[in-house]
Amino acid sequence: MLTFRELKKLAKSEVEGPEYKVAVLGNVATQFFSLGIKGYLKSEGINANVLDTDYNQIDAQLLDTDSETYKLNPDVVILYIATDKIYEEFLDLNVVLRESFAEDYCKKIVNYWNLISNNSNSKIIQTNFTEIDDRAFGNYSAKVKDSFIFQIRKLNYLLEEKMSERKNVFALDLLSIQIRMGLNQFYDNVLYYNAKMAVTMDAVPYIAKNVTDIIKTFRGSFKKGIILDLDNTLWGGVIGDDGLGGIEIGELKRGHVFSDFQRWLKSLKDRGILLCVCSKNNEDTAKEPF
């Protein structure tokens, strides 16, 4: 993983090839986020032109057809709507209105998509929402409809449903990044309140890489196959030495790991990813476990 310092340097580098234009719109500060994306795209040989729009100006950018976003005519528009900011909107609502917060906010985001689609040919990358549990209801938050944790989880679900209906909208899964990194590594209260940044500097490269991976698929660059060894990869042990009865596979001990790995590989196969084998075993020996 590249560091932010490395990404900052890469963002200034020259890359040959046609320009790839990206507009970043957010309800929080996105300067470092945009810089990280530009650096990561250039590290992959993509001549990126990244427009970082002003703080919390999504409506102004999308409603005005003469805005800098539309003038750029971007290949991709990134909508970075941070949980921290909409949490403030949630708290400002009358308690009676909080139960419909997820539905109402989902409609607002879908309207953003419509504006972009009606005024450009841009693809849309939409962030989902990380979780903030204010503990106002404690563990009951998961069953109380007017709690923020209930509404933010519902909003993520509603967004997933809506994105599945739109061919030009793609998810940037911030929640998964938060879970992998851990809340304290992903988010810093001090940074948010002082600089309106919704993620730490350590998190920026991870997010930028995910954006880059999405954009690479737009450009036709993605993994089409996996080449695997057999021994101690698809099963534990060496089939040529241990024999069919001696390799580790199944529900017991290490065998469980290999069984689950095979299940995951099968899910990739079901997606159309080619599974290939490269093994030093004799062909007949290698085929025994199959």
Where are the language model's segments positioned?
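Metal-dependent catalytic core segments for phosphate chemistry
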Residues: G236-E248, S279, E283-F290
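Catalytic nucleophile-elbow at a beta strand-turn-alpha helix junction centered on a G-D-S/GDSL motif
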Residues: P18-L35, D231-L234
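Alpha-helical cap/lid subdomain in secreted, periplasmic
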Residues: K12-E19, S34-M201, K209-K224
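Short hydrophobic segments within beta-strands
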Residues: V24-L25, T127, C278
